[in-house]
Amino acid sequence: MRDLLNLLKQQNQVEEFDSIRIGLASPDMIRAWSYGEVKKPETINYRTFKPERDGLFCAKIFGPVKDYECLCGKYKRLKHRGVICEKCGVEVTLAKVRRERMGHIELASPVAHIWFLKSLPSRISLLLDMTLRDIERVLYFEASVVIDPGMTPLERGQLLADEAYLQAIEEYGDEFDARMGAEAVQKMLKTLDLKGEAIRLREEITGTNSDTKIKKFSKRLKLIEAFIDSGNRSEWMILEVLPVLPPDLRPLVPLEGGRFATSDLNDLYRRVINRNNRLKRLLDLNAPDIIVRNEKRMLQESVDALLDNGRRGRAITGTNKLPLKSLADMIKGKQGRFRQNLLGKRVDYSGRSVIVVGPTLKLHQCGLPKKMALELFKPFIFGKLERAGLATTIKAAKKLVEREGPEVWDVLEEVIREHPVMLNRAPTLHRLGIQAFEPVLIEGKAIQLHPLVCVAFNADFDGDQMAVHVPLSLEAQLEARALMMSTNNILSPANGEPIIVPTQDVVLGLYYMTCERVNAKGEGMLFADINEVRRAYETSIAELHAKISVRITEIDPSKPEGEGETTRLVNTTVGRALLSELLPPGLPFELANKNMTKKEISRLVNICYRRLGLKTSVVFADRLMYLGFRQATLSGISIGVNDMVVPKEKQAILADAEEEVKEIEDQYASGLVTNGERYNKVVDIWSHTNDQVAKAMMERLGSEEVYDAKGNVVKQQTFNSIYMMADSGARGSAAQIRQLAGMRGLMAKPDGSIIETPITANFREGLDVLQYFISTHGARKGLADTALKTANSGYLTRRLVDVAQDLVVTKDDCGTTRGINITPFVEGGDVVEPLRERVLGRVLALNVYVPGSNEVAIPASTLLDESWVDYLETLGIDAVKVRSPITCETRYGICAACYGRDLGRGYRINIGEAIGVIAAQSIGEPGTQLTMRTFHIGGAASRTVTTDRIEVKYKGNIRLHNVKIVQHDSGKYVAVSRSGEVHIVDEQGRERERYKIPYGAELSAGDGDTVESGQVIATWAPHTHPVITEVAGKVRLQDFLEGSTVERQADEVTGLTSLTVLDPKQRGAAVKELRPMVKLVDETGSDLCLAGTDIPAHYYLPAGAVVSVEDEAMVGVGDVLARLPQESSKTRDITGGLPRVADLFEARKPKDPAVLAEISGTVSFGKETKGKQRLIITGSDGERHEELIPKWRQVNVFEGEHVEKGEAIVDGPPVPHDILRLRGVEELTYYIVNEVQEVYRLQGVKINDKHIEVIICQMLRKVEIIEPGDTSFLKGEQIDKPRLLEENEKMEKEDKLPARFEPVLLGITKASLATESFISAASFQETTRVLTEAAVTGKCDELRGLKENVIVGRLIPAGTGLAYHSERRRKRRMLEQPESLTADTGTSHYGEDEISESGAATA
C-alpha cells in the first residue's frame, strides 16, 4: 500500500521555476530527449490495431498502449512496474508516458530549419552575410558555394552555378572546397569565427559614417553577439536529427467503418521518413549525384513542410485538398496552442442558460434554477449528505441525489447559503462582465438577473445567455464576495461614475411620478408631513401630479445627534413627496424635487455614494428600482400612432427650402457658383430645414396649452408618451422622434457622401417608393457596419490589453515631482470639460498656491477628491500640475501616487491593481458604440468649419496668449501671429472660454479689456489668407511681369481688376525662376526693415495670390497687401470613430501630415527643385535646417518670419512621432489624449484621461540609443527603458560613460511585439517570428507580466496574486542565501511580511 502512495506522490511533483529560457536544441540534446529512433513510416497494423515496431507509434519507443501492460501481453498488472519485456521490448508503466516520450529521426543528410531560413529577417543569411536568395539556391541544389577558397582567387561565400563550378575545377583542381545543400551551409556556419567577426564589425561601425551601413552592421553584430552570449551554436540552425512528437499528441483515432482519423502531423512525418529512408538507400548504393541531389532536396522540402507548411513554395495538401497542419500551425493563430488552450480553457463547475429579468431580487442576488444548482454543487451536496449521516458512502449519496428526494433539496439550500456564484455574459468586454451574486433557488430553467446590473453586463432579455461559475476554494469564495460581488461594483472603472443606475422602465416610472400637471386634483393643498401626503394619495384625494406644499424634516448626518434636524415647508408635487420618502437621511429634498430624468437619477445615485457610502447607495438603488417599476406599471404609458404629431408648420418650411434650393440651382445654371459650392449649399439648406421642422415638432409634442384653476390659458409639459420616453432618457431620442413625426432628412450613400435630395416625409405619413429606396441605402450600410465594427472593436481591445497587460501598481510612491499640466478642455470656444472633472482623483505634483500670493492652498502629493476640487474651483485656478503614469519613475510597474484614485472604488489605488488591463478594457469596451463612418465635410459638418468671428459667450476680461498685434491707422488691431489664442476670464480669474486667433484677424478689443456676453471681439475673412504689412511705406512690386509671372483679372460683378500670381508650372522657361514679391521702401527707395530687426520687409507671394495694391502705392501698418484664396472645396475625409482611435494608438503617420519646424529660427526660401519648394530655417546660433515641401502644399510662414521649434510650417494632421521629437512627451500626451477623447465625446462616452495615459506610457516603453557611451548597446538600438537605466547606473558606479538616449513612440501592435517577454509576444501575433528571434538570442522570460503567468498556469502577479509571488520570491531568496536570512526579511516592497506561511501556500 505504501508503495502505491509513493507512486501517487511521484506523479504530481511540480518543479518550482522563476523563468523560462528558449534556445536552439543541439543534435545531442535531441538524441538525449529521445527514447529511440523511428525508422519506419508505418503507424499501426490495420488487422491487429497494434502499433508497428520502429514505426511512428512504436510501443517500444514511446511506451505501452494500456496502463501497466506490455504489447505482447506477457506482463500485466502493477507488480511488474518498470520491467522491460524481453519479447516485445516495451516497458511496463503508465500509458500516459505516450504523451511525454519523444523519438527522433536520424537524417541521412543535414537539413536547414525553415524558421531560421525564411522567417524574416533570415537569421542564416544575416549571419553568413549572404542574400536569402543565394542561400536558397545553395540549399535547394541550384548552385554550389565556395566554403574554403584555399589559394585560389575565389572568395568564401561566392556562388558557382554548374558551368562555373566545372570550369573552376578544371582551372584549380581540388585547391578549393565548394559544396551545395545544407551540408555546405552547415560547414560555413561551423567555420565562422563569431568572436573575430564581432570585433571586426565593431571597428567598422565606428569607422563609417553611412547610416545604411551602420544599420546593416548593427543588425549583424546584434545577432552575432546574441549567439556568443546565449551559448547557442550557429550550426544548430541546421538539423541533423529531427525530434518526433510523442504519439498521443498526434493521435490516430479509429472511426466506425474501419477508417481512421489522424493528425496531419503523422502524414508529414511519414513523408519525411519515407524520403529519408530512400536517401539512405541511394547513398548506400552510391547512386548518381543527380538522383541523390534530388532526393536531398525532397527531404529538405518535406522537413520544411513538417515544421512550417506553406512557408516556402506550395503547401502540401491532404486528401481533402486542404493544406496539412504543421507544427508551426499548431501553436499560432486563434486556434493554436497559445490562444486556444493556454490563455483560454474550459472550466469545470460551470453551466449556462438563458436569462430572464428578476425584478424582485435584491442587488446582490441572482435566481439560479434548482436543476442547475443541483448539478453545479453536486460534490458539496454529497459531502454534506455524508456528514449529516443521510448517506453512508459517496455512491449512496449519488443515488439519493439522483432520486431528488426532499432531503436533497434541504441540503442544497444549506450548501448554497452564502456561497456566491459568478455570472458572466460573453463578450466580457470589461471587468464588470463577470460579477458574483448570492444564488436564490428558483423553479424553471432560466437564470434570473437583477435589472440594475444589465448595464454593466450589457445584457437584455431577448434571448441572451449567461454562464454560471462556482468558486470552490475558501479563498476563491472570499475574493468573489469581497471583490466581485455586484454590490461592490457600483462605479464604472472607466470613468468613476455609477454604473448601477436605473434605465428604461424604471426611469420612465420615476419621471412620470415627478411630473407636474396644471389643475390636477388636490392642487394647492398643504400637508403636515409626507405620511399625510401618502394617505391623501392612497384615498384619491390628491393626484400624483398635483402641486402641493408639504412640511419636511431633513437630517444632516455630519452634525452630532439631535442637532442636524431642520424642518421647513416646500412646494412640490405629490409624486415628488412620495419619492423623497426613499431618500436616505443626509440627502437634501432638493435632489428629488425636480423632474427625474435619467441624468438626474444618475446624479442622485452618485451623490448618495459619495456622501453616504456603499451600503446606503445599494439599498437606495434597489428601492428606486422597485418604486420605478411600480409607477411605470401604474402610469399605463404606451405608444399609439396618434402620439406622433406632425407639426402644421412643416409644409410652409419645406416650401421655403425648395424656393432657396431653386435659387441656387439658377445661380449654378448661370455659372455664378461651382458645382461643389452648389452641392454644399443645398445640403446646408436641407439640414437647416430638417432642424427647423424638428424644432417645430418638438414644440408641438413637448408642450400643450391648458386652463389653470383661475381659467387662464397656460403652457405645460405634455404627457405625450413618446415625448416622455425621450425626454426622460428612458428610450429613444429626439433624432428618432424627428424621423417619426418630423422629416427623415438627408441620407448618406454607402461611401459616406450625402445624397442631396432629402426625404421630406416621415414614418407617420409614410414614404413613397423613391424615398423608401433611398432609405435602404443607409439602412443596409448600417447593418454591414455593425458586423464589421464588432470585429474591429474586439481586435482593438485585444491589442490594447496585450500592450498594457503587464502594467501593475507595484509601489506606494516613486517620489517624483514630474507630472503633466492639466487645463480645462475647450472645444469651439466652449469649456467642454472643466478643470474639476479632469483633475478629480489625481495626485498633485506641485503645491497649488492661492492666486496672487505665495500661500500654499493645497500641498503637493494631495489626492484631489470632491471637496478639494470644489476648493480649487473657488480659488479660480485654471491649470494644475498633476502626477501621471507617463512621468512615473517606478522601474517595473507604476506607483499608486502617479495613478491616483481607483475609479471603480473611489479611493487611492491599491498595490497590485492591474491598471494596464483596466485601462485597455475601459478604452476598448465602448469601441462597439463608436461609429465606423468616415465623415466627408458636408452637410452639418461644413457649417461649423467656416467661422469668421469670435463671439464671446460670457462676460469677462480678455487675456491674449502669444498674439503679435499691429495697430492699423483706423485704430483697429490686426493679429500677425499664427498660434495666438484669446482667453476669456471671469471675475474670479477662472477661464470660461478660449479661441484661436487666425493670422490677419481684426480685433476690436485689446488685452485686459472687459467684454460683455455676445460681443464680437474678432473678425476675419473666412475663405482667404491675407498677407499683412507690419510696416508703413511705399509698395514696390518686383518680378511682376504681366502675362508671364502674373496676370490681370477683372471681376465681372464689381468691374475692379486685380493681379494674380501664376503657378511656376504654367510659366515659360525664361521666367520660371522669377519670384514675384512685394517690397516696402521709404521715400528714398531703400528697403524698410521689420520693427526691431534688420530683416527687410519683403513679402514673397506664392502661386494663386491675389495682389490688392498697385505699384508705388502708399500703405499703412496692418494693411492687406495680397490675399491667398483657401481651397475649401476639397473635401478632406475626417476619419472618425473606431478607425481614428486605432490610428492614434498605432501611432500611424497620417496622409499629407503637417510639417513642423525642426529648430527655432528665421525662415527663408531657397532654390526650388522640381515640384518642391525649399524652406530653410536658420537658428540664432547659425544652425541651418532645410525642408523640402511639395509645391501644392500651402506654407504657413513668410520669408523672414520667426518660428519656434515644433511650430507647424505647413498645416495638416501632425505626426505623433514629430510631436514627441520636437515638443516632448507632455505635448504628445495632450495630443493623443485630446484626439482620442474627441472621438469618444462625440458618442457621449466618458473615459477618464488616466486610462489613455496608461496606454501612452506603454507606447513610450522603449528608448533609442543616440550615443552608446561605454555600454554594450549600439547606436540606434531600441531598448526597454528600465534595462537602459539599470545599465547606465552600473556605468556611473564604475565611472564610465553612460549611454545617451531619446524616447521613441511605438504603435500598440509594435510595442506588444517588442515586449521583453517572448511568451507574451508569441501569444499575441506573428508567433513564428517572435519564437525564432527568441530562440536565436536565447531569451529568458522572467514571467513578470500577467499573460506569461496565465500561460504557465500560475496565479497572476496582480491583485491577491501579488502577495503569492513576492512570498515565493522571498522563500527563494532565503534558500539561496541562508546565512543572510535575518537581514533579508524586510527588503521587499510588497509588504509580504504580513502574509502568513499558510496563506502563501494555499494561494
Swiss-Prot record:
Look up the EC number in the record and give it: 2.7.7.6
Q: Does the keyword Zinc-finger apply?
A: no
Tell me the superkingdom of the source.
Bacteria
Which keywords annotate this record? DNA-directed RNA polymerase, Magnesium, Metal-binding, Nucleotidyltransferase, Transcription, Transferase, Zinc
Its GO biological process terms?
DNA-templated transcription
Q: Give the CC-aspect GO terms.
A: DNA-directed RNA polymerase complex
**Chain residues that bind Zn(2+) 1:** C70, C72, C85, C88
Q: Where Zn(2+) 2 is bound, by residue?
A: C814, C888, C895, C898
Q: Give GO terms: molecular function aspect only.
A: DNA binding; DNA-directed RNA polymerase activity; magnesium ion binding; zinc ion binding
Task: Give the compositionally biased regions (Polar residues).
Answer: 1379-1388
Say what the protein does: DNA-dependent RNA polymerase catalyzes the transcription of DNA into RNA using the four ribonucleoside triphosphates as substrates.
Cite the record's note on assembly.
The RNAP catalytic core consists of 2 alpha, 1 beta, 1 beta' and 1 omega subunit. When a sigma factor is associated with the core the holoenzyme is formed, which can initiate transcription.
The family classification in the record reads: Belongs to the RNA polymerase beta' chain family.
Q: What is this protein called?
A: DNA-directed RNA polymerase subunit beta'
Q: Which organism is it from?
A: Nitrosococcus oceani (strain ATCC 19707 / BCRC 17464 / JCM 30415 / NCIMB 11848 / C-107)
